[in-house]
């Protein structure tokens, strides 16, 4: 090809071809040693290139691994973030303390002053002992011992046990606004609990429930977190060998409580030596021993409305048999200061004693001018009432006091039971029997504190009647079998059988039903009575009069096996119907059978004079 016609590219290819041919020709005449050296140097160059590439690849892999590990750690690794313990315990003020009670973190209702820890009265009531009573009106703390009252005034180092004054080196009760705080050291004199105080932040750890608990030890240094998960903030660092209380299993985590009162979560794999332990504390509970008769109580209430009526005691008792206790209605609270009216009679008591009867005088709160809250929430008023009752009992030779406080409002319940506690001390010291009347237990009367009554009082009496009463919207039995049975069974959940007396009615109600008029239905709209189609009225009748009214009406009596009573009905004027569930020997025998089956302390009855003569033989059969 003519070189003048060749392109640059063609010329470059031709040059390379000639150079390669020249190298090949030269190689035929080259020294063999020189060729070897050249090849060796070429191999070294290739190895260096390969090693550099491998090193670069390794570095790349390491960098990628580190980056991936960092990303994985950020996403899945345990955080070292800590949670603010002041926030955790709810501490917002310098004097506040966090509170953990029985492995539960509570609101920070505790304070510290001068090295003394104080717990709020509300927490004392709920977690330590509800036997401590704070009078917010007169600023007095009270605790009831079997034969003494412990008293401590607010912001004082002094306290009294009955008439003996003692002192502590700390203020016993501190007040901040409406809140009372009680020194834990003082509480521990009378209540069974342990406590420890910790710092940073200040907190108190209390144990008031003793018994079996699950524990485990920490394998290696670890963390307790606010939630189950490695990303949850740390509440507390725990050391190898630390003992934790195990509260709950949560997947791969356990909910635990540390010694310092922190409740949180730790991985199961961090724990070992799980076992059950029993915790206890040496403490002698006060023994509120009272009076227990060595016979079954056979009591009847005697409604006495005037001093003159006391003279009828001989006639009233003439037909009775087997009776051993009588309760005359002698005392009534007359004002909010705790004063009482009394129609007690020494002659009455003397005659009852001659008949072999004890006298347990009744006190009621039926005066509409008396405000139960005002009366019972002031210590001075309660004490005045208690002293007047006991003094009247001693002056008249009375054997016991029967408390019949009815329709106590819910918010007065704590003050009412404190009254019973305080009265029990005076009765115990003066050898007086204390009995307390109660409704059949229902959800709406739990504030009567039957369980505490069962500790403080000698006898707890169930008023096993008024199932249907004067204001009821429908006719029904005064004391059906199931109603009485429920009353006994529910009371026995709270009170020992040897303190329980079941009261039966010597009366019934005669009901009159008439269809409501349009006007009456209109009046009842929006009220509880709206759902009832009949207007009902009733009158209370004693056993004899009730039987007489049925006889006069010519009605047929049939046994109602559901309520276990004889039943009768008849037509009256103006489309009205009369209904009556009779109380008689047949119905009372069933109720007395319940008393016997449950081995109760005895029976009571309302009221003397309403019974027929055959009833006493029946009762005698069950109480003897």
Regions found by a protein language model. Give the residues of each.
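Glycan-binding loop/region signatures in secreted carbohydrate-active enzymes
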Residues: 281, 508-591, 623
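Glycan-recognition patch characteristic of GH18 chitinases/ENGases
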Residues: 278-383, 388
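Primary recognition of N-terminal secretory signal peptides and signal-anchoring hydrophobic helices
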Residues: 3-4, 8-9, 15-16, 29-250, ...
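Conserved, mostly hydrophobic/aromatic
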Residues: 326, 403, 460, 502, ...
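Acidic/aromatic/glycine-rich contiguous surface patches that form carbohydrate-binding/processing clefts
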Residues: 587-624
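Short, acidic/polar
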Residues: 305-320, 378-394, 442-450, 583-596
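Substrate-binding surface in catalytic domains of secreted glycosidases
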Residues: 336-340, 387, 410-546
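SH3/SH3-like beta-barrel fold
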Residues: 143, 241, 253-258, 266
């Amino acid at each position: 090809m003519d070189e003048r016609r060749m392109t640059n590219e063609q010329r470059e290819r031709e040059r390379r071809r000639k150079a390669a041919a020249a190298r090949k020709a030269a190689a035929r005449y080259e020294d063999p040693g020189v060729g070897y050296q050249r090849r060796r140097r070429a191999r070294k160059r290739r190895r260096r290139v390969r090693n550099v590439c491998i090193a670069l690849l390794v570095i790349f892999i390491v960098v990628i691994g580190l980056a991936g590990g960092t990303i994985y750690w950020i996403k899945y690794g345990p955080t070292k973030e800590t949670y603010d313990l002041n926030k955790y315990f709810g501490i917002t003020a310098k004097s506040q303390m966090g509170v953990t009670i029985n492995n539960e973190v509570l609101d920070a209702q505790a304070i510290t002053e001068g090295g003394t820890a104080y717990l709020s009265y509300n927490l004392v009531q709920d977690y330590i002992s509800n036997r401590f009573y704070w009078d917010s009106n007169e600023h007095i703390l009270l605790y009831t011992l079997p034969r003494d009252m412990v008293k401590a005034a607010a912001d004082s180092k002094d306290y009294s046990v009955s008439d003996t004054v003692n002192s502590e080196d700390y203020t016993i009760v501190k007040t901040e606004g409406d809140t009372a705080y009680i020194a834990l050291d003082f509480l521990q004199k009378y209540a069974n609990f342990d406590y420890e105080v910790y710092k940073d932040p200040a907190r108190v750890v209390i144990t008031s429930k003793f018994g079996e608990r699950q524990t485990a030890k920490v394998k290696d240094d670890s963390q307790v977190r606010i939630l189950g998960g490695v990303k949850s903030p740390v509440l507390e660092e725990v050391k190898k060998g630390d003992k934790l209380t195990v509260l709950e299993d949560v997947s791969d985590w356990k909910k635990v409580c540390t010694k310092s009162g922190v409740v949180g979560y730790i991985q199961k794999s961090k724990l070992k030596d799980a076992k059950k332990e029993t915790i206890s504390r040496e403490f002698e509970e006060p023994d509120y021993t009272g009076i227990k008769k060595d016979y079954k109580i056979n009591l009847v209430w005697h409604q006495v409305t005037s001093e003159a009526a006391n003279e009828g005691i001989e006639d009233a008792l003439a037909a009775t048999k087997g009776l051993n206790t009588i309760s005359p209605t002698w005392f009534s609270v007359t004002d909010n200061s705790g004063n009482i009216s009394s129609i007690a009679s020494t002659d009455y008591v003397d005659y009852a004693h001659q008949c072999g009867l004890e006298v347990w005088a009744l006190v009621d709160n039926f005066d509409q001018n008396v405000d139960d809250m005002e009366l019972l929430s002031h210590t001075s008023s309660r004490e005045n009432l208690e002293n007047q009752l006991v003094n009247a009992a001693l002056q008249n030779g009375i054997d016991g006091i029967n408390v019949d406080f009815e329709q106590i409002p819910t918010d007065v319940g704590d003050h009412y039971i404190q009254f019973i506690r305080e009265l029990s001390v005076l009765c115990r010291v003066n050898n007086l029997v204390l009995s307390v009347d109660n409704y059949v237990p229902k959800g709406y009367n739990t504030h009567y504190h039957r369980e505490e009554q069962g500790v403080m009082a000698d006898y707890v009496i169930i008023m096993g009647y008024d199932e249907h009463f004067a204001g009821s919207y429908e006719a029904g039995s005064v004391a059906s079998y199931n109603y009485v049975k429920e009353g006994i069974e529910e009371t026995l959940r709270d009170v020992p059988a040897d303190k329980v007396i079941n009261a039966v009615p010597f009366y019934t109600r005669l009901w009159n039903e008439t269809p409501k008029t349009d006007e009456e239905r209109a009046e009842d709209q929006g009220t509880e009575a709206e759902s009832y189609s009949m207007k009902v009225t009733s009158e209370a009748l004693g056993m004899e009069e009730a039987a007489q009214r049925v006889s006069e009406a010519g009605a047929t009596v049939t046994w109602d096996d559901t309520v276990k009573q004889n039943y009768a009905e008849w037509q009256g004027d103006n489309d009205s119907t009369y209904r009556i569930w009779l109380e008689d020997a047949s119905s009372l025998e069933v109720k007395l059978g319940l008393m016997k089956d449950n081995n109760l302390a005895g029976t009571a009855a309302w009221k003397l004079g309403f019974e027929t003569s055959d009833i006493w033989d029946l009762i005698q059969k069950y109480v003897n």
